[in-house]
Amino acid sequence: ELGMGDTFGEEALISDAKRNASVIMASEGTLMRLGKDDFRTLLNEPMLDWVEYEHGCDLVEKGAVWLDVRLPSEFENYHLPDALNIPLYFMRMKMKNLDTSKHFIVCCDSGRRSSAGAYILSERGFHASVLKGGLAATDLARK
């Protein structure tokens, strides 16, 4: 259940995916809507920090954590060493178990899902970056 000031639909706007839920207002209220272009300009782009793979590796050596938001089956095929797997669709439920003092570098195959994951984490006060180019830009994809 959503409360006053809560938001929904960010994942679809960020990753260019279809909405994954319908929301029904249970009582009278006002719904504010922000179009996709305005959302990207005002909220998404300023909140996202993109890092190159090599820089991400340096950050992980200093204590950052790779956070892979792909499906478990995708993660099992290949993933970055010591990566944590929380599928994007579980992010809101599972992020309460994450250490807020850690820097998370969110990754997926292309960067689309990871940008949604990093946005959700940033919105909740986490230090989150997105792996630029996704796993396709890593040594794993080059093999």
Predicted regions and their residues:
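Rhodanese-like catalytic fold shared by cysteine-dependent sulfurtransferases
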Residues: 4-7, 11-22, 26-55, 62, ...
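Short, surface-exposed ligand- or partner-binding patches at beta-edge/loop junctions that are enriched
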Residues: 107-108
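Structural scaffold elements adjacent to functional motifs in cytosolic proteins
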Residues: 66-68
